[in-house]
């Protein structure tokens, strides 16, 4: 007896199951690698790292001041530009995460700052003295 021909969705289901079983078997190893890399890369700098950080920053400053960027190849320039843009974009993403809103800080419509309230009181006091 011949095996029945599988339909499109049955093939997709079988493929998805095979991928899931493979990924499920690989997960512990990959999670351990991710955890080790995250622990190393996301840790704040140690006291011993500061001299190297200062030296690297001095190199960047001298590179900019001496115009060393003019001698870069197109490829190097594009790579440095891409890295700089990535840092800037992640800064803005962090800002959005920090304020928990995409477009700006949520300020209530009836919010009045303390300095504005103080100014209004002063103006009302002056108006009362004039009358």
From Swiss-Prot:
Pfam families: ATP-synt_G. Its main location: mitochondrion. GO terms for cellular component: mitochondrial membrane; mitochondrion; non-motile cilium; proton-transporting ATP synthase complex. The keyword Zinc does not apply. GO terms for molecular function: proton transmembrane transporter activity. It is found in: Mitochondrion membrane. Keywords: ATP synthesis, CF(0), Hydrogen ion transport, Ion transport, Membrane, Mitochondrion, Transport. The keyword Transport applies. GO terms for biological process: proton motive force-driven ATP synthesis. Belongs to the ATPase g subunit family. Mitochondrial membrane ATP synthase (F(1)F(0) ATP synthase or Complex V) produces ATP from ADP in the presence of a proton gradient across the membrane which is generated by electron transport complexes of the respiratory chain. F-type ATPases consist of two structural domains, F(1) - containing the extramembraneous catalytic core, and F(0) - containing the membrane proton channel, linked together by a central stalk and a peripheral stalk. During catalysis, ATP synthesis in the catalytic domain of F(1) is coupled via a rotary mechanism of the central stalk subunits to proton translocation. Subunit of the F-type ATPase which has 2 components, CF(1) - the catalytic core - and CF(0) - the membrane proton channel. This is Probable ATP synthase subunit g 2, mitochondrial. It comes from Caenorhabditis elegans. The gene is asg-2.
